[in-house]
């Protein structure tokens, strides 16, 4: 079985944020995830919109790294983030139960996601001390390896009247 392919969508807020995203993507690759990141997969002369469209449709999952700037750009439809939002909104409308998109929070202020992701459960990576726990939750989702298996349904403890002892 091939490792899950994961496209990482983020805004280029600062050099330190880009470095965090690069380290995050490297960690995913080191733990069995085929992470796709512009910092590795794009070079001068490549077509950015084509890259985004291709990876958004080709990937098994899309991780959206939500910062204040990311949320602002997505909600306003600006830049690459706005373009990706347009593609993902269309995809989400086609399949309402789509769990392909996983928002992660990387903010210093109030945790927030773009409006179009408002119904999605997110993972909060804003506190570095909880990063291993949150990474474990994310990896379990991407690798379909839940922490707890849902138990099988047992048999009905009640028997129908016509099969029970009538003398009781």
Annotate each language-model stretch with its function.
Residues 79-84, 130:
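Short acidic-hydrophobic sequence patches enriched in Asp/Glu that either
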Residues 23-53, 68-77, 81:
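Conserved BB-loop
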Residues 52-56, 113-115:
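Short glycine-biased active-site loop of nucleotidyltransferases that positions the nucleotide triphosphate
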Residues 83-99:
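Arginine/glycine-rich "motif VI" loop of SF2 helicases in the C-terminal RecA-like domain
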Residues 62-63:
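Inter-motif core of Ras-like GTPase G domains
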Residues 67-68, 109:
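Flexible loop residues that form catalytic
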Residues 1-30, 75, 96-168:
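C-terminal interaction surface of TIR/SEFIR-family domains
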Residues 59:
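An anion/phosphate-binding loop that grips the pyrophosphate of nucleotide cofactors and donors
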